């Protein structure tokens, strides 16, 4: 028996938003760690990010990064990007095209920083930016950080590097794999026009 969303566009939207919402708090969700892809000139770069917010009302997705990360420089030059989600058990793939907004030391980051746990804040306390060349294997952290030997007050030093990337969704392509026959659809969130596609 096929799921309700097999041939119903509205049910498809309800399904993928439910999966995105769940991924924000469910560490076991495959949708929690999508591939984020952005491009600069003739190079396309991809990496795993952690989904931190899903907002259906405003068509937004959100993740955190370090202001010194190379992807921030790329997004400053070209804010268009894509997120790729896949859930093996659900057999659902999402290709999400977005426009990105970089937030640093503003109300958006203040709100997210307050929710960021002690264990996660150390990522923003490294002396060297992400991607810096090193002669030896390294976490980039001094031993005190690796051992979590710092207070919440000391962790505030990392706030200047803490950055929130807001991804305004332009379109979503949904693919469902089924033995009976795959299903594929595109949802244009800018024009509110949806269409079935040949898988």
Kindly label every feature range from the protein language model:
Residues 1-199:
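Binding-site signature for planar aromatic cofactors or substrates
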């Amino acid at each position: 028996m096929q799921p309700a969303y097999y041939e119903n566009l509205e049910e498809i939207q309800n399904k993928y938003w439910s999966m995105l919402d769940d991924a924000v708090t469910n560490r076991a969700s495959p949708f929690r760690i999508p591939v984020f892809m952005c491009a600069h000139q003739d190079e396309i770069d991809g990496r795993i990010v952690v989904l931190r917010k899903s907002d259906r009302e405003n068509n937004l997705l959100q993740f955190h990064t370090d202001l010194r990360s190379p992807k921030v420089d790329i997004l400053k030059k070209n804010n268009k990007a894509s997120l790729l989600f896949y859930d093996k058990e659900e057999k659902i793939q999402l290709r999400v095209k977005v426009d990105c907004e970089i937030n640093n030391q503003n109300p958006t980051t203040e709100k997210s920083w307050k929710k960021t746990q002690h264990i996660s804040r150390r990522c923003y306390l490294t002396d060297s930016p992400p991607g810096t060349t090193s002669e030896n294997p390294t976490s980039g952290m001094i031993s005190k950080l690796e051992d979590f030997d710092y207070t919440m007050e000391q962790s505030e030093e990392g706030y200047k590097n803490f950055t929130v990337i807001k991804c305004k969704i332009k379109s979503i392509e949904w693919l469902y794999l089924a033995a009976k026959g795959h299903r594929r659809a595109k949802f244009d969130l800018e024009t509110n026009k949806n269409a079935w596609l040949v898988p």
